[in-house]
């Protein structure tokens, strides 16, 4: 028995060591990280590097502090050996409502959650928002609202100009503009230049922009799909990272990473978009070889279908007539003969004849500091805007005056639409109208040949109805005829916003009718309350007595 005493500490140590894998360490939470059970169990926080932590105590009781793809640690739901990786019943977003503007339901770890939208349509539909910024389209505004936890709504656009339309001031006003001066639209410090990187290499695209206030920068890769992925600063997207200064870094380049990467910079004064071409080649591109003149068919993508094996990872450049420049297309070739160019530069030199249109280039400030006010054309906004030019390394989209810019570039000559004018204010409009409703616009059908159209409205409240019996019939939807509409500048503007509207109009032959002077305004609580007070006090009857 005495001989066993020296062995007791050793046996106790072995016992504790054998159970170390099942019991949590000192201060740690029970369970293991998801990727310790299966490499496929990378969850959201581990792939986007959110919710950073240094130990389990920084996380909730049911979470572990696990390593993420950025080399740091994030809080994620703990897993246990033998537990199912996913719930037995399939989760669903049906009936799950996301109250935050710009968020959509998604399934995460077997539960429905709300995520901010990260893909938007690539078609422009410029939207001025209540935060003073101009967005590429409505989807971009909603995504930004979700990211910042705000509610943004559409407002009428107001174009801010930094200088008067006249020529620049005296020579002594070349000092750097003071912070208290008027807002300045975004401008690049240098023109985007095409880059070529070998497979497995690293590429860096820097959207270095100036502007006042400092512009917000996002990136997206142009594709042939309906929507593009919006890439924001301080985020990782696969092998792409966008840094806090608006620099896009692509690691371990693959052939399918080739394409046009578009930088969007915006502030309260304007919007700028610039394309950065990136080619991914199998070998070091030859610099001395002169490009051969291709056949016209070689510049265009191969549209014929081949029955043989395809090359999904072979991406070539072709000329896109609609865009006026080269873009990437998936390589299609019969018997291995793929048609196209390996780099953007080779495609442009061979297929883009002539110097090109300077008006489609982004505004470039340049690295010098001889500050001068200049004008540049924005193909997105279809108008000329002022910017600060440094004095060197600019491009052709650089004009001394607004007049010379508008003479050189396709500025629409039609005057802007004026604000819709009501025939009378709220009280008088209410008394002169046959109906007053609160509803949401569901559809607008234009009939330009008849100078009219039809608006379908989902009713929320009937405030006044003298001739249609909407409440008695329990009508939920009302079809309103739009009379005398100029669809170039529609009044009343029945397409503005998607919130509830106060709509007042006439009834002709049993049909609700709106004309250019009809009352259509946003249904604010104050406005609806005012209408109810007027109806309760029988203000219209008193007004008719005075008129008689």
From Swiss-Prot:
CDD domains: IgI_3_WFIKKN-like, KAZAL_FS, Kunitz_WFIKKN_2-like, NTR_WFIKKN. The keyword Aminoacyl-tRNA synthetase does not apply. This is WAP, Kazal, immunoglobulin, Kunitz and NTR domain-containing protein 1. It is found in: Secreted. It comes from the Eukaryota. Residues 164-184 are annotated as: Disordered. GO terms for cellular component: extracellular space. Coiled coil: none annotated. The gene is WFIKKN1. Residues 299-351, 359-409 form the BPTI/Kunitz inhibitor domain. InterPro entries: Elafin-like_sf, Ig-like_dom, Ig-like_dom_sf, Ig-like_fold, Ig_sub, Ig_sub2, Kazal_dom, Kazal_dom_sf.
